[in-house]
């Protein structure tokens, strides 16, 4: 916690300078706004007189290492294979947290979002295959299965505190299960020819990370170092490197080093020492007792938390406000031409468009309706099926996740460009339509109490 967060702390000049940025990043929809800005910039850049510089930038080779131990890849591949591995690492941390202590911890709680996510994956894939089955484009069935959680939640947050908390939690849980589905699709269906030796190296690295967890190692550095080996091994094995992020997250310790009873007793003792040491006006630097007391509280705070929480808290801002906007900037720059517009009416583009737009809303709503009708799940008080239909619209915002899967699903650059254009069109319609529908459904509703 910085001093600007503490009531009564004297504001510093840097606080006034950074205040506008802090206000922006405190807005729930800020990551979605940045994503949208990056997308618009990419589209304008790719369709301007500087389009050649746009494509040349991402094609530049970047080399990491030295001599025979160097890895050289185009900048866009460092983004898609490297930065996106960090994104999937954070996704993996979220999945693990939700399974252990969140909406997916209880089978009864988890039933509704899991069923909705499965419906929201199967129906879009089915629509796509109905239009493209047996063709060269059939491999793209995984593209309309994806949901962009940042955009979907960002648009939902624009509706303010009239949105029931249960709906926000539901959409988050659906997106997390959806991400898990996307991870499995990437791992099992969009994997190149496998290298057994590198696969074994990756398996060994993952086993070492699990061993570190079992031994009670709570420092992040050992996991980071072994995780880099895991990433490199999977990159060379043929399995997509982003899977290393998910596997690494599964090995991160998720339990506190202190039992609740021990934590309570130690906390009381630490606070007592802290209060006694802080008596008087002696500066901290001049008092060894005060310095020791502060250090003691810091150590207790670190032990009370979990490595999973610390990593998620530290990495989430980087993912939301840097990695995803950079990914959008590098991948959303589709050059619009007459040929590209005509391709929007091809089965590939139509399969993605209708899969995201109709498949998501139909799959999510149908799954919720079936579970409620069969008595397996109940809708929260004051929330009707219509609101879940609105959530189905927002789940059709595939954007970054769908674009990422499209880059893996297709080899033909023309197919990739057509898929990107279709994803952008479907995501825009789903986002705008979902926002307008939810706005109507929430009209006259009392704001949620904090």
UniProtKB/Swiss-Prot annotation:
GO terms for cellular component: plasma membrane
Keyword NAD found: no
GO molecular function: sodium:proton antiporter activity
Transmembrane segments: 24-44, 75-95, 111-131, 140-160, 169-189, 196-216, 224-244, 318-338, 352-372, 390-410, 422-442
Membrane topology qualifier: Multi-pass membrane protein
Protein family membership: Belongs to the NhaA Na(+)/H(+) (TC 2.A.33) antiporter family.
Function of the protein: Na(+)/H(+) antiporter that extrudes sodium in exchange for external protons.
Name used for this protein in its record: Na(+)/H(+) antiporter NhaA
Taxonomic placement: Bacteria, Pseudomonadati, Thermodesulfobacteriota, Desulfovibrionia, Desulfovibrionales
């Amino acid at each position: 916690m910085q001093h600007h967060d503490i009531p009564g702390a004297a504001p510093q000049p840097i606080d006034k300078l950074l205040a506008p940025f802090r206000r922006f990043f405190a807005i729930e929809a800020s990551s979605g706004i940045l994503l949208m800005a990056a997308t618009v910039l990419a589209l304008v850049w790719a369709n301007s007189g500087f389009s050649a510089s746009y494509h040349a930038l991402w094609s530049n080779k970047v080399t990491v290492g030295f001599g025979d131990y160097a890895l050289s890849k185009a900048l866009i591949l460092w983004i898609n294979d490297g930065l996106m591995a960090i994104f999937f690492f954070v996704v993996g941390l979220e999945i693990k947290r939700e399974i252990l202590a969140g909406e997916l911890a209880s089978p009864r709680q988890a039933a509704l979002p899991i069923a909705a996510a499965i419906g929201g994956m199967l129906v879009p894939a089915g629509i796509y295959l109905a239009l493209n089955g047996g063709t060269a484009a059939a491999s793209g069935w995984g593209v309309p299965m994806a949901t962009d959680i940042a955009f979907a939640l960002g648009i939902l947050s624009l509706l303010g505190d009239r949105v029931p908390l249960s709906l926000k939690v539901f959409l988050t849980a659906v997106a997390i299960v959806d991400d898990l589905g996307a991870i499995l699709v990437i791992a099992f269906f969009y994997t190149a020819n496998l290298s057994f030796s590198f696969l074994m190296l990756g398996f060994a690295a993952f086993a070492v990370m699990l061993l570190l967890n079992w031994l009670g190692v709570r420092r992040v550095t050992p996991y980071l170092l072994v995780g880099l080996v895991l990433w490199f091994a999977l990159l060379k094995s043929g399995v997509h490197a982003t899977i290393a992020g998910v596997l690494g997250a599964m090995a991160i310790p998720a339990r506190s080093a202190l039992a609740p009873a021990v934590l309570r007793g130690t906390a009381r003792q630490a606070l007592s020492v802290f209060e006694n040491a802080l008596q008087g006006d002696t500066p901290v630097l001049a008092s060894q007792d005060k310095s020791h007391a502060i250090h003691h509280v810091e150590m207790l705070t670190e032990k009370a938390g979990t490595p999973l929480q610390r990593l998620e808290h530290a990495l989430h801002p980087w993912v939301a406000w840097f990695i995803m906007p950079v990914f959008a900037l590098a991948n959303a720059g589709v050059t619009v031409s007459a040929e590209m517009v005509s391709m929007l009416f091809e089965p590939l583009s139509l399969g993605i468009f209708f899969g995201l737009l109709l498949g998501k809303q139909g799959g999510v709503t149908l799954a919720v309706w079936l579970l409620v009708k069969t008595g397996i799940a109940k809708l929260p008080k004051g929330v009707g099926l219509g609101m879940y239909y609105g959530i189905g619209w927002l789940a059709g915002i595939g954007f970054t996740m769908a674009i990422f899967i499209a880059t893996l699903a297709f080899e033909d650059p023309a197919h990739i460009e057509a898929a990107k254009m279709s994803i952008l069109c479907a995501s825009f319609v789903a986002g705008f339509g979902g926002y307008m529908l939810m706005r109507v459904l929430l009209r006259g509703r009392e704001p949620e109490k904090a």
